[in-house]
Amino acid sequence: MVSSSNLGFPRMGENRELKKLVENYWQGKVEETQFQKELKEIRINHWKLQKEAGIEIIPSNDFSLYDQVLDHIHLFGAIPKRYTPVVESEIEDGSNGLRTYFAMGRGYQTSKAATQVSETNTQGAFASKVEKSIDVGSMEMKKWFDTNYHYIVPEFEDSQQFKLTNYGGYSEPKPIHEFLEAKSIDIETRPVVLGPISFLLLGKSSDSSKPYSSKFDSLVHLNALLGVYEELFKQFEKIGVKSVQIDEPVLCFDLFETELIKNAYTTAFNVIHKAAPNINILIATYFGEIRENIDLITSLPVNGIHIDTIRSSSSEVESVLTKIPTSWTISIGIIDGRNVWKNDLTKSLVTLKNIIAKTGSDRILLAPSCSLLHCPHSLTREIGRVESQVLDWLAFSLEKLKEISFLTYALNKCTFTTENTITFPEDTCSKIKEYYQLNKESNQKRRESKLIHNDIVKKRVTEITPSMLKRENPFPVRREAQRKRLTTLPALFPTTTIGSFPQTKEVRLARSNFKSKKITPEAYDQFIRDEIRKCIKVQEECELDVLVHGEFERTDMVEYFGEYLAGFVFTQNGWVQSYGSRCVKPPIIYGDVNRPVPMTLEYTTFAQTLTTKPMKGMLTGPVTILQWSFVRDDQPRSETCFQIGLAIRDEVTDLENKGIACIQIDEPAIREGLPLRLSDWNQYLKWAIDSFLLSSTGVKDSTQIHSHMCYSDFNDIFESIQRMDTDVLTIENSKSDLKLLKAFEKYGYTNEIGPGLYDIHSPRIPSVEDMKDRVEQMLKYLSTNLLWINPDCGLKTREPETTRLALINMVKVAKQFREIYANKE
């Protein structure tokens, strides 16, 4: 018999209950006992929902207050030494470990430390009862493989020690606690643990002066780490755990150091098997193809494997299946865990019947392709709010679990003819038959819908020429023209921000009232204009050089543009976690994309009338819009990206024609779109960079094109970054210990650049001294003539006053360096 299973469930809740609860905890608005009570309610509700959807194998330990990798960092006692003052403060006041946990994720600054930095009393993270001056930044964040989710990067010392810890008020390690919690309501779960090899390979050296020279260097810590896995799995066996899912997504990478990797995996899984010989181990891979790594996997003492069939070709799946031992469980990721389209159940049944013909049914588990962390919670609240024809094509997490449940039922109970038609047993509930029939009709309607296709858009894509993918002149010529035009710009160390400014409760309320028609469009427009005025006043008081309008009209840098572009649809509650408590609501691209009307022209040109300084036009680039949306799956992603590129190009032209001299086209997502396999990179990078160039190159030399990139390791794609040919590139760098700058030095980057001077994801206020030190480090790698001074990302999630104080300090730094280098000249 085939069984139904799940790899992971969205954490936030149907109405983002977790986000609100955690943020209230940070602000001291909820007591510890109530906090733990409500967390438990969320977890139990999620387990019950999965059971009610018909899932037999339900995960535990997939829940997290911030990030699953951060959970493992704390669980394994791998807390960097700079957080020792936070740890000690918890010991002194009897806290539960969560202050340290959240400090690693978002930084920690006591009121006393904030006062010393800013001369104002500002509270950072939830306070210690023992008031000390503690000021520590957050750990680095990176994108989780090629998704828009961010994980906290583990840090390892030369002689890193690990120990299994309890935190968060638990009397046992988190995976143990959550298994027992589910068991208390009669739900037997399969705990999810990040595998030891993936955990180490996702990490970095804690010493920025001695970075790892190879991505495999962190494996030196394997033997020390395995002690905690051994202890954890012994505890699993002791409490009656029958099966554990060990996530090893790096097994979809090119693992060139074959013997090193083989020895590491063999050692690790031998230790785990010996510690818990009676537990069935399922190795979960996802986001790519296993390919040659199947030989390594099948040599390990485990009991099963999960295959992502959505990201694997049919020939790859067939090849892998032939090598799996006959005694193993095979988890088939048949439902797309990363997109929102309704599964074609007939097509999936054909695929699964072919697999079962080779493997038999008794060892088959059906599952999503990956954790449903990357998919919204449920379609329940979208009924009547999303265009009905498009809504009929969609499936969110709960709907996907029901698809898995149906496929499991059909494979176990139904018969199939040679024409792939399905015959239900006589006692089948009419609702099951109706469910299948409606699925067939939905998929047929989507294939035939006239909503999807626009012949004019398709024709424009075919007419793209090489001349549309390059600027008229090289950067030195353009730079001279831009400096002549931008007369207020200082010769050295110009300052700017990345775009968005803090969105207060008042801004969010006004937007909500506008969308619910509680205020008129005219009243909302006036409110936005007033916010823009205040934003420009703050920037001028801070003495910034290139200003922004603040983006108060925008909820999200992708959602806003999608609302103006044809081919997009938006949900009311389709939230997914991005990092920590931050959620995003990705638009859904269902058809051909074009720009019926200008998107940013009105507020950008209005803002420019309020200042004599340059006002940046703020746009999101085509690759980022693509990456941060749920994308149609009926044509190549490259085709959709070129369509978006043409739409952005039209907007850039309009801004230039209205006198906007600086236009920023953000592309923070270019690197995250890279396929997991190196052999697939060139094809992706070709169309991704071409799409950006298509959007950015149709301007005069005197128009300065900016772009922003964040959470990116540029070393291995530097030639592609150079090919973007932006006049000013701003990058997230504050969390990366300046390691990105070494790539710019190595490859001789000659355009202007603004590495992030401080981390906006942390509530702490950066000091002048901290930022001066960072600039001094930057100048070891970059020319004074090319360096811009700016934060590392947009300021939307920060508080207005801490933002103002941080920018004042940042401008002080720029002025000091202008004075230093003016004197040198």
Swiss-Prot record:
Q: Name one Pfam family in it.
A: Meth_synt_2
Enzyme Commission designation: 2.1.1.14
Superkingdom classification of source: Eukaryota
The protein's annotated pathway:
Amino-acid biosynthesis; L-methionine biosynthesis via de novo pathway; L-methionine from L-homocysteine (MetE route): step 1/1
Q: Which family does it belong to?
A: Belongs to the vitamin-B12 independent methionine synthase family.
The cofactor named in the record is: Zn(2+)
What protein does this entry describe?
A: 5-methyltetrahydropteroyltriglutamate--homocysteine methyltransferase
The protein's matches in HAMAP family, at most eight in alphabetical order, are given as:
Meth_synth
BP term (GO), one = methylation
The residues the record assigns to binding L-homocysteine are: I498, G499, S500, E551, D666
Q: Where along the chain is 5-methyltetrahydropteroyltri-L-glutamate bound? A: K19, N148, D556, Y579, R582, C583, W628
What UniProt keywords are attached to this protein's entry? Amino-acid biosynthesis, Metal-binding, Methionine biosynthesis, Methyltransferase, Transferase, Zinc
Species: Dictyostelium discoideum (Social amoeba)
